[in-house]
């Protein structure tokens, strides 16, 4: 933290996270997304895959984490979260979570500070908070969210988006 009780993140950390987020990264995991059961009702699925930096290094704390949960409500979008993590911080994310949202209490001086932002959303770092500021996105297909995320995260070599295998017609 910048000050003992300031609540502000360390500016050096914010700068480092932004620098890594802006670098070109290479997908070094498998040639397809590997989903694992995350439990819940309806059942959710998660995927976590490593990335390499331009120098070839693969920091253990640099990865893409995805979460998918089919909607249990007809006409309500499925839940999808696509996140870039570095040093245990969510530095960039695209989230779709149906008819929900939050008020941006961080991001002073940014366009959506103090405003309610529904889903879908783009999460980025602010000077006053590493996570917690979101801007609205246009609704799109899950595949397009993935393509958009991979593009803005600067990730090359990522596999195409594939949903986890669901047991259609059976309760999950």
Residue ranges and their predicted role:
Residues 74-79:
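Short coil-to-beta strand junction motifs in C2/discoidin
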Residues 50, 65-67, 83-85:
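Residue-level recognition of well-ordered beta-strand positions that form the cores
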Residues 58-73, 92-95:
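Broad, structure-driven detector of short, well-ordered beta-strand segments within folded domains
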């Amino acid at each position: 933290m910048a000050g003992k009780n300031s609540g502000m993140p360390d500016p050096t950390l914010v700068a480092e996270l932004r620098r890594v987020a802006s670098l070109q990264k290479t997908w070094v995991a498998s040639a397809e997304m590997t989903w694992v059961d995350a439990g819940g009702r309806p059942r959710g699925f998660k995927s976590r895959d490593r990335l390499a930096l331009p120098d070839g290094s693969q920091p253990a704390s640099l990865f893409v984490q995805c979460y998918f949960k089919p909607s249990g409500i007809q006409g309500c979008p499925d839940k999808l979260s696509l996140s870039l993590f570095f040093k245990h911080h969510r530095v960039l994310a695209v989230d779709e979570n149906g008819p929900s949202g939050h008020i941006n209490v961080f991001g002073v001086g940014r366009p959506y500070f103090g405003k309610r932002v529904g889903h879908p959303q783009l999460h980025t770092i602010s000077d006053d908070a590493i996570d917690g500021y979101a801007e609205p996105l246009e609704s799109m297909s899950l595949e397009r969210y993935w393509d958009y995320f991979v593009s803005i995260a600067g990730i090359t070599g990522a596999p195409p988006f594939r949903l986890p295998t669901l047991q259609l017609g059976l309760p999950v």
